[in-house]
From Swiss-Prot:
Stated name of the protein: Small ribosomal subunit protein uS7cz/uS7cy
PANTHER family in alphabetical order: RIBOSOMAL PROTEIN S7
Taxonomic lineage of the native organism: Eukaryota, Viridiplantae, Streptophyta, Embryophyta, Tracheophyta
Pfam families to which the protein is assigned, alphabetical: Ribosomal_S7
Localization, UniProt: Plastid, Chloroplast
Family matches, as InterPro entries: Ribosomal_uS7, Ribosomal_uS7_bac/org-type, Ribosomal_uS7_CS, Ribosomal_uS7_dom, Ribosomal_uS7_dom_sf
Length: 150
């Protein structure tokens, strides 16, 4: 059976959620660069909002975490999008993935600036990641009739 890997906490904030985000920022094994981007984004969040950046991060992830997603099921030659409730760990992972996809799609500037802007927007219940969650919920709502295929 799949074992859930133990997630360490990051060195400065001592927070698992922060480390999950850093692990997803990571590209080509450059973890020190990923930490640098994350800490610059956190510093900018503190400057822009005058709030604890970790609380902004938690609020952003909580806001983007989906309640339901759709899974594709094939039944008798037809394909259905079946709505399924999300397990909290998977929801958090999806939220982090969507936040990073949204900030990578933002135009120009450095990754730290885009990440901080996206996290602030998500904490305020706006931004691309929030739209992705709402879109996912709409698709699940539209396919509610197929819930019995679970």
């Amino acid at each position: 059976m799949n074992e859930i890997r133990n997630i360490e906490s990051d060195p400065i904030y001592r927070n698992r959620l922060a480390n999950m985000l850093v692990d997803r920022i990571l590209k080509n094994g450059k973890k020190s660069l990923a930490y640098q981007i994350f800490y610059q984004a956190m510093k900018r969040i503190r400057q822009k909002t005058n709030r604890n950046p970790l609380s902004v991060l938690r609020q952003a992830v909580r806001g983007v975490t989906p309640d339901v997603v759709t899974e594709t099921k094939r039944v008798g030659g037809s394909t259905y999008r079946v709505p399924i409730e999300v397990v909290p760990a998977k929801g958090k992972a999806l939220a982090i993935r969507w936040l990073l996809i949204a900030c990578r799609k933002r135009s120009g500037r450095s990754m730290a600036l885009r990440l901080s802007d996206e996290l602030i927007d998500a904490a305020r219940n706006s931004g691309s990641a929030i739209r992705k969650k709402e879109e996912t919920h709409k698709v699940a709502e539209a396919n509610k009739a197929f819930a019995h295929f679970r």
